[in-house]
């Protein structure tokens, strides 16, 4: 549930080298610029927890990189991001783990705003690409799948 003062990031599993303040600042920036001020909360955790959440809520028994849980009330909702998936994808695509977490967070926020790239004929992909460029992020999730 989103905190009253704004978006928050909880690091359940994170190495000491992870630049937490940068990720927290990015969450606040997303809240302000992309979500029109609506707060959301992000949990950064391990593959096992993402697998459990994916299985419990989507009936898909595998770890995924990001899950979105709309709130239906005040605030946008919650995101869960796999640190393991983020680390692997950052390595694969040649950028930092903080950039990958930011890409995943943007993708998740767009889902919280009601966009669904699986059915919207490219609308979410277009939004993600536009926001990614504006926010200075490397290639986004949808673009990777489409290329």
Swiss-Prot record:
Keyword Endoplasmic reticulum: no
Record bears the keyword Cytoplasm: yes
Keywords for this protein: Cytoplasm, Endonuclease, Hydrolase, Metal-binding, Nuclease, Ribosome biogenesis, rRNA processing, Zinc
Coiled coil: none
EC code: 3.1.-.-
Positions of transmembrane segments: none
Alphabetized InterPro entries for the sequence: MetalPrtase_cat_dom_sf_prd, YbeY, YbeY_CS
CC annotations in GO: cytoplasm
Positions of Zn(2+) binding: 107, 111, 117
Enzyme class: hydrolase
BP GO annotations: rRNA processing
Cofactors, names only: Zn(2+)
One Pfam assignment: YbeY
Any one GO molecular-function label of the UniProt entry: metalloendopeptidase activity
Compartment(s) where it occurs, according to its Swiss-Prot or TrEMBL record: Cytoplasm
Entry's cofactor comment: Binds 1 zinc ion.
Family note: Belongs to the endoribonuclease YbeY family.
Function as written in the Swiss-Prot or TrEMBL entry: Single strand-specific metallo-endoribonuclease involved in late-stage 70S ribosome quality control and in maturation of the 3' terminus of the 16S rRNA.
Name by which UniProt lists this protein: Endoribonuclease YbeY
UniProt source species: Solibacter usitatus (strain Ellin6076)
Name of encoding gene: ybeY
